Amino acid sequence: MNNLNTNMTHAGRPRDEAAKSAIMTATMTLLKDFKFANLTIERIAKEAGVGKATIYRWWGSKENLLLETFLDTADDHVVFNQEAPLLDDFKQVIVELTVVLDSALGRALITAILEDRDLLDQFHQRFFEPRRQQASQLLRRGIDDGLIKADINSDMVLDMLFGDVYMNVFFYGKALDTASIDVILTSFMKGIMI
């Protein structure tokens, strides 16, 4: 099992951002051609132009590297805009979430977290929960603005909304298309709006 400690202190020099970027880019590039199980730190290091020791020193394992690469990508794309209209914000996040999860990187992470409980726990803690909290804040804003029913169970409502995305990608192996996302969002909004 992996020891995925998010508060790790790394000995030695701080990470070189150019090398970090090269390693993450190499990881994403190689995942287009190789299954995660067949991807090695040696291959990533060669593609990135760094030593294997650099990768092991910074991440400890390819699973840790995979998760951090996914998080880095998701942090750029799967972001709530608390100022946007409610429906637009949910749609943007669902579209971006679908794209990220359906990418070679996302599919590799899905495979890895289904096989590694520690990695799943880290995914939940570092990706899923922060976005769920942001979505809950968005619902709270809708309630405060008088747009959404005050008596909704936000956890259940968010499970209903995002469950379709995760179900399709994790279990059916397909991403939702824009038309399906629109249908889901329309039904979702009808159920929670005043």
Model-predicted regions and their roles:
Residues 100, 104, 120-145, 155-156:
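Amphipathic alpha-helical packing segments from all-alpha helical-bundle domains
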Residues 1-8, 92, 99, 133-141, ...:
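C-terminal peripheral helix-coil segments that are non-catalytic and often amphipathic
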Residues 58-59, 127, 166-167:
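Tryptophan-centric aromatic hotspots in well-structured domains and transmembrane helices
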Residues 69-70, 101-122:
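Amphipathic alpha-helical segments used for helix-helix packing
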Residues 70-77:
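Short, basic, alpha-helical segments at the C-terminal edge of helix-turn-helix-like DNA-binding modules
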Residues 78-104, 157:
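Hydrophobic alpha-helical connector segments
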Residues 49-59:
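Short hydrophobic/aromatic patch on the recognition helix
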Residues 1-34, 38-47, 64:
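Basic, helix-initiating cap at the start of DNA-binding domains
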